[in-house]
Amino acid sequence: MKQGKWLDTSISFMSMSGYSAPPIFWVALLLIMVFSLEYQLFPVAGRYDLLYEIDHVTGFAIIDAFMAKGEYRAHALQSVIEHMVLPCLVLALAPTTQVVGLMRSSVAEVMSQNYIRAARIKGLSNREIVTQHVLRNAIPPIIPKVGVQLSSMITLAIITESIFNWPGIGRWLLDALASQDYASIQAGVMVLATLVLTANILSDLIGAMINPLVRKEWYANK
């Protein structure tokens, strides 16, 4: 709510760190050295411990572990979750900080508008101002930009899967490139392109649907 305070400064520092973050493979190796090798909190690589046999029904490790039968299902599910922590953290670190920075800029722009001053003059509390005015006007411009983040996350996923030995479409593409399997390369690129295009279209539509200005234009054109 207040620019220049410790919370606003922390968010600004976090967002700038995301834009100027070191390479993802360096971050991944650093987390492996600290949390896996030094403190032994999380596994180094793989999807789950080799002690458990999980049938590949859906291809999603956490769903397959949940659907597995046997007395060790809970332990297998815990193993899958522990193996997911570091890859998910590495994959989400840079995009999350960038989205937080975009959200901060959007909130700061909304807070400087005249209707926010009018709401304060009316005696509305900070909570009412944030929920009824700030978020409703700050979130819609961010949603299309979040959809654009998907293309960069796919690139990060390819590197993350290779480092953590996690089987996925990114590692599958790298194996196809190594073996010169052009049919698999074409299929993988087509799937990723369709996924990115669909995500961008949906993010634009959702952002337009919840944008008050766009809704007013739609109602006016009816």
What are these regions (language model features)?
Residues 1-8, 55-222:
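Alpha-helical transmembrane segments of integral membrane proteins
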Residues 16-84:
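Generic hydrophobic transmembrane alpha-helix motif, especially the helices
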Residues 1-16, 28-33, 157:
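Transmembrane-helix boundary motif in ABC transporter permease subunits
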Residues 12, 44, 131:
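Phosphate-coordinating loops and pocket residues in cytosolic domains that bind phosphorylated ligands
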